[in-house]
Amino acid sequence: MVSLKTVQASNAGLRALPNITALFVGGTSGIGQSTLRQLARYADSPTAYIIGRNEARTRPFLSELQQLNPKGRFHFIEADVSLVRNVDAACQQILQQQKKLNFLFMTPGGISLGGRNETVEGIDYLFALRYYSRMRFIQNLLPLLEASSPSRVISVYGGGFEYSINTADLDLKHNFSLLNAYKHSITMTSLSMEHLARTHPAVSFIHVYPGLVGTNIYTNSFPAPVSTFYNYLVWPFMKPFSVDLGESGERHLFHLSSAHYPAKQGIVPQGVPLEAGEVAKGITGEPGSGAYLLNWKGDVRPSTKILAQYREQKIPQLVWDHTESLMDQAVHR
């Protein structure tokens, strides 16, 4: 476990990397908001883009960020990122304004107890938020990421919990269930990141499991009776085993900025320098491989047998080819 003291010392070193540019997708609440708050607290003159659904509700948080870092620049982009075409439009705004992007941090999602809920683009709504839209952000912004140092992508979901998936029905058009969607979102994220780290070695990719964190996800996902039951009757029993939201933000900023998780062939610097220790082992088991599975403590989660099997079968390439094809089809529907 990376101690909180080590995390905070590393985050303080972020001031030595001025003018960091970052994009937070889902940065208006929960883990994304907490991590962005820590970036504002620690970084010197950062530029941050925040993508969310409602600018009016986000204005108080934007004011808070400006107070935390008067030299920082914080830009809100209003978008429903369950649609790939909206992801493209948001990315276009950033591409027109920036020549580099150091950090891409993605947390959009939610919880559902229902069946497949297709968007107008033919993708299940939560599957889009958890996987396809996140991959579209990466695909669109790779030119900016590759022009930067440090350069890192983080997807917060279920790194280390990979399962076997139906490679003949990756988007679950014919075999949808909540469990299958959970498995596919996680495993396809890790496989795509492994592929991208190999094909874009100047960028570091991290799939992290955040642990149990006290956020408003149930309030945002369910009507009052269900969310009230969870918040007042279930959560009190779970809270002792949870990660404080502020600490989660500090730890995720460490994941974003520490040289412990470098790109495979990135330009120096690879983040805040290490005080001690070696670089982390990646998905393939190779130190510094450029793609990492982490738990909330910053520890590397061991790569599963299924990932090794899929690597031999060249499934990472298959998954990424499918992902690119489906996203391109979606925007033309």
From Swiss-Prot:
Superkingdom in the source lineage: Eukaryota
Alphabetized Pfam families for the sequence: adh_short
SUPFAM superfamilies: NAD(P)-binding Rossmann-fold domains (SSF51735)
EC number, as in UniProt: 1.-.-.-
Biological process per Gene Ontology, one example term: terpenoid biosynthetic process
Group of enzyme by EC: oxidoreductase
Annotated pathway: Secondary metabolite biosynthesis; terpenoid biosynthesis
Induction of the gene: Expression is positively regulated by the cluster-specific transcription factor pbcR.
One MF annotation (Gene Ontology) recorded for this entry: oxidoreductase activity
Oxidoreductase is among the record's keywords: yes
Record's keyword terms, sorted: Oxidoreductase
Family statement: Belongs to the NmrA-type oxidoreductase family.
Function recorded in the entry: Oxidoreductase; part of the gene cluster that mediates the biosynthesis of the diterpene ent-pimara-8(14),15-diene (PD). Within the cluster, the HMG-CoA reductase AN1593 functions in the mevalonate pathway, which produces isoprenoid precursors. The geranylgeranyl pyrophosphate (GGPP) synthase AN1592 is needed in the formation of GGPP, the precursor for diterpenes. Lastly, the pimaradiene synthase pbcA performs the 2 cyclization steps that convert GGPP to ent-pimara-8(14),15-diene. The putative roles of the remaining cluster enzymes in ent-pimara-8(14),15-diene biosynthesis is unclear.
PANTHER family in UniProt: KETOREDUCTASE (KR) DOMAIN-CONTAINING PROTEIN-RELATED, YALI0E05731P
Protein name according to UniProt: Oxidoreductase AN1596
Originating organism: Emericella nidulans (strain FGSC A4 / ATCC 38163 / CBS 112.46 / NRRL 194 / M139) (Aspergillus nidulans)
Lineage start: Eukaryota, Fungi, Dikarya, Ascomycota, Pezizomycotina
